Amino acid sequence: IGVRRVGSEMCIRDRDETDPVIWRGPVIGGVVQQFWTDVAWDVDYLFVDMPPGTGDVPLSVFQSIALDGIIVVTSPQELVSMVVEKAVKMAEKMDVPIVGVVENMSYVACPDCGKKIYLFGQGKSEEAAKRHNLPLLAQMPIDPKLAALVDAGKIEEFEGAWLNAAADALEKTQKRAE
């Protein structure tokens, strides 16, 4: 199994990994198109991690890739909910199906008692999802174990009950597409 990925940093030679990639719209659109057409993906799910908002990258993805659905990933801060609203409205205007909303950094669980501590507030993502009749698929905690596995390149070893709803929604989307 495993995760396959491609990114702009793989396309540019002789650069330090901390150097920014500064591209304008037409170049971004071309790179997105190239990722889609020139890479032999052979995957059941293709995740496209995009910058927040409604700029060139989401526009290029929505226009050039036949999408079965998108998952809007957000965090609980008030300002972020405005960005999510824009992304959802953009997808709706472009007839891109939305599978649901996933809230990242929802809370941290106390290691001693398990109590959820909402560092960035609570309920904003759920409210935004409800306004658009979308399911809130998962609320991902800030989890040091998950962070350690990601850093070690072993994300597939992670198990978290909060992930099940999102996985179920993806499976339903795949079945509808077949």
Segments the model singles out, each with a brief description of its role:
Residues 13-15, 52-54, 76-80, 105-109, ...:
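Conserved nucleotide-binding/hydrolysis micro-motifs of P-loop NTPases
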Residues 88-178:
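C-terminal lobe/tail of nucleotide-utilizing enzymes
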